[in-house]
């Protein structure tokens, strides 16, 4: 089974962190977002992947090749022309066998094997209160009748959350080719939902699959919430002398923590150093330094330094804050 994972986006909603690191390499619950995605795909039988890279793509390539042994093809999306365009660029890696498509800012907890047992293409959906930020699926007689990308007035609360099982990928590629050839865009981009709608209009049957465990990593507040949810299912942390742990927490074995209170809902990544601090509901990234601080609901970037802070902060890589 092959999965296509588009990760070419800039991740502007996660600034300042994404000035120096691609969104999918931001650490959450002990590993980068893309690491959680790859682990789940492999667990469910995916043995080939196409990673669509763009912004800071070499860093993503380096991480994948270092940590995963499955067959991986990298495709570069030089112009950000939409999700549909990203999938179309992957066409040479696609055979006639079914494929999975999963967006790179979505961590999921779903029974993919059950999803892929369908005789039809399947789109993962999640019921939301406000569907205007999403593609929306409208259902008739158990099948998807209409897909609308970020509608002003949604007629359904079934948000398409970025997990797709495509039974006939060559039909999808043909529809994407037609969209691009005729320059059909929605909100300025070639949308995957428009190609899927074209497939439906041509007679393709598609069903929905309820994704209960869907964790958005696209904004600081949702990233921290995802960190909290994933940590709740993590193994208990190893106790450390002089450190009070309030689970759930993740502390890398390569992190140094002294005379501090850590947790709940806190990740401290490899190489980080935390001393004389209280840190809760936060993510401390690789090689960051935190001392004499009380941090809550905060994200500290890689190689950043925070001293004397009693605040909620969101500080990017290689930055320094001192409050004395």
Indicate where each model-derived feature is located.
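Short internal beta-strands
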Residues: 50-54, 125, 283, 299
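Conserved N-terminal catalytic core of the sugar/cofactor nucleotidyltransferase
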Residues: 2-5, 13, 27, 31-103, ...
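Active-site metal-binding loops of divalent metal-dependent hydrolases
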Residues: 10, 105-106
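Short N-terminal binding/cap micro-motifs at the start of the first secondary-structure element
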Residues: 11-16, 132
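Conserved core of the sugar-phosphate nucleotidyltransferase
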Residues: 107-183
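A structural signal for short hydrophobic beta-strand segments in well-ordered beta-sheet cores
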Residues: 25, 137-139, 208
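Short alpha-helical oligomerization interface
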Residues: 20-24
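Left-handed beta-helix
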Residues: 178-324
């Amino acid at each position: 089974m092959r999965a296509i994972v588009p990760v070419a986006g800039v991740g502007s909603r996660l600034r300042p962190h994404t000035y120096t690191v691609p969104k999918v390499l931001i650490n959450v619950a002990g590993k980068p977002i893309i690491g959680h995605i790859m682990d789940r795909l492999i667990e469910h039988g995916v043995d080939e992947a196409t990673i669509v890279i763009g912004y800071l793509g070499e860093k993503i390539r380096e991480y994948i090749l270092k940590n995963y042994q499955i067959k991986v093809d990298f495709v570069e999306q030089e112009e950000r022309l939409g999700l549909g365009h990203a999938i179309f660029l992957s066409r040479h890696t696609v055979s006639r066998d079914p494929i999975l498509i999963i967006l790179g800012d979505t961590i999921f907890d779903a029974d993919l094997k059950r999803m892929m047992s369908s005789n039809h293409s399947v789109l993962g959906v999640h019921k939301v209160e406000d569907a205007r930020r999403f593609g929306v699926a409208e259902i008739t007689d158990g099948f998807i009748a209409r897909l609308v990308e970020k509608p002003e007035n949604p007629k359904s609360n079934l948000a398409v959350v970025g997990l797709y099982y495509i039974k006939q990928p060559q039909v999808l590629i043909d529809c994407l080719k037609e969209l691009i050839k005729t320059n059909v865009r929605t909100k300025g981009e070639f949308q995957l939902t428009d190609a899927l709608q074209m497939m439906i209009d041509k007679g393709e049957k598609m069903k929905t699959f309820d994704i209960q465990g869907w964790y958005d990593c696209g904004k600081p507040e949702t990233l921290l919430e995802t960190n909290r949810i994933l940590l709740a299912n993590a193994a208990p942390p190893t106790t450390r002398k002089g450190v009070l742990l309030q689970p759930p927490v993740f502390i890398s074995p390569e992190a140094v923590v002294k005379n501090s209170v850590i947790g709940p809902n806190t990740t401290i990544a490899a190489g980080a150093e935390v001393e004389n601090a209280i840190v809760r509901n936060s993510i401390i990234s690789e090689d960051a330094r935190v001392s004499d601080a009380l941090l809550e609901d905060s994200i500290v970037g890689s190689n950043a330094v925070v001293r004397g802070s009693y605040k909620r902060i969101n500080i990017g890589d290689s930055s320094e804050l001192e409050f004395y």
